[in-house]
Amino acid sequence: MTVVLDTSALLKRYLSEPGHDLVSQHLKQDPVWCASALARSEVQLSLHRVASGPVEQRELWSTFREDWDRIAVVPLDERCLARSVEIGANFRLQIVDALHLAAADRLPRPLTYLTFDSHQIPAALSLGFEVASTESAVALL
C-alpha cells in the first residue's frame, strides 16, 4: 500500500512527540512513500524553526534529505492546483491543506494518508483515503 505524508506527519518522523511512533510504524510497514512537492519546503522551514541551533538544524535537515530522496514527490502542477481549489471549497480548507490532499488524490488507491491536522481528516476520508492519525477519533465524532 502507498503511504502519503503531509507536512504534519513528516515532522513527526524527526521530532520526539506524540505521533512519532505511529509514523515510524507506517513507514516501516509500507515501502512506497509519497508527499506533495510543497511538503519539502514546509518541513525544512519547520525543522529550522524548532532546531536548538545550527548543528541540530544540519542534523535534522540531513536526516530529512535522506528520507526525501526515497519519497515519490507529487508535483503541484496546474491539475493539482485546480483540484486543490475544489477540495478547499468543498471542505472549507486552507490552501496548504487542500494542496496536500489534491496531491494525494492523484495517486492510485488504496492509500494511507498520514496527517495530524484535524482539518484534513474529514476531507481525506471523503476522498476515500484510509487515514492514520492520532486525531482520527476526534475528527470522526
Question: Which residues are covered by each model-predicted region?
Answer:
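Acidic, PIN/NYN-like endoribonuclease modules and their adjacent C-terminal/linker elements
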Residues: T2, R40, D105-L141
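Short, well-structured N-terminal submotif of metal-dependent ribonuclease cores
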Residues: M1-L38, V50-S62, F129, A139-L141
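Acidic catalytic patch
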Residues: S62, D69-F91, A98-L101
